[in-house]
Amino acid sequence: MLAGVQLSDGLKLEAIADGGFSYAEIPYEIIEKDELPTYKKKDGDSRVLKVSGFSYPLAKLTPDKMYELLENCRRYQGNYIVLDTMNCEAGILENVVEECSMMMTDYRIPVFIENGCNGSDETGYLNNAYSDISSLKSIAEYCNRLCDTAIVGISINVGYSNLLAKNVRSQIDQCSEYLCMIHANDNGGVYNEKQMPFTFTRGRGNLITDWYHIIGALIKIEFSGWMIFDNSGTFARVPEELQTQYVRMLHAIVKEWQGQFTFVERVLNKPDKKLILFGAGQMLWDYMDVLGNKFPPYFAVDNGKMRWGTKVCGVDVKAPSAILDVPAQERNVVICCM
């Protein structure tokens, strides 16, 4: 998983680099206004901040603009172009690709089409032609047929999904073969606030956005694309002297999420041992949904006597003492904490 932060008004490139990231996503309007801003390195600093790619509103896309985007993406060594579909009519990308397919194939720069909706914070938000994953898949399939290669992929904007009360886990499952990017931003489901992940809770700390299950869904499909934090709402209000600390928090979130990806290889991938999971509640159900086929447990144990002798997704649930029935050198006991 490759991670970066989207540049936004008020956020400085120095903060992104000092915060630990190697990639910055650039809204193309910055390039249109002026050259890409540079950042100052400290003495002895070996960091390199690279352009992950450009973001651009699909509503403004034309064949000439597509050429300009591809040319500048190559110039700045970007890796993709992601198209924002908020308040956008249907058919725009298809029409552009019909005219530009050969050029896009020659450049070989991936183009990601993102989920979106119509509306504003004042009027509320409704579905548009790009709200459903099935529509995005149809667009990607059509464009890739025109290009005769896989050029167009899908980006899921978590915040936009929240505005329409979409199930992000289900969206990830639906487009797994096309999913190339996640735009990670948070809101309360009403306003397009673009805050940092984990910002919004309900009641006594219940997350409005189910980030852990979103990451679980990405692990399930073995996601290896881009995770870009587009948190312009946060950085519009953070004092400049605190920007680096906030970016470091984002970097810590990435490390924690990446740790969940590597957890599989570090802890579960021990084929010479019997996997025993400790805990047979909801987290065991979640484990079986995400990893059960790849790393099936030998059995599970639980402190709750009511669960002993039951099965969860075909896995026997036993008393903790059953662990001792398996020789120590043959067992791999893992606390189930999906």
Region locations from a protein language model:
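Core-facing hydrophobic residues within beta-strands of well-ordered domains
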Residues: 21, 179, 224, 295-297
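Gly/Pro-rich active-site loop or hairpin
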Residues: 63, 122-133, 160-224, 313-319
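Active-site acidic/histidine proton-transfer and metal-coordination neighborhood
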Residues: 58-153, 163, 248, 254-261
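Short amphipathic alpha-helices and their capping/turn segments at secondary-structure boundaries
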Residues: 14, 34-45, 68-74, 95-103, ...
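Hydrophobic, well-ordered beta-alpha structural blocks that scaffold small-molecule cofactor pockets
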Residues: 241-338
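Conserved beta-strand positions in the central sheet of alpha/beta enzyme cores
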Residues: 25, 81-82, 112, 155, ...
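N-terminal pre-domain/capping segments
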Residues: 1-79, 109, 148-151, 255
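Acidic-and-aromatic substrate-binding clefts and catalytic sites of carbohydrate-active enzymes
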Residues: 7-13, 26-38, 57-65, 86-93, ...
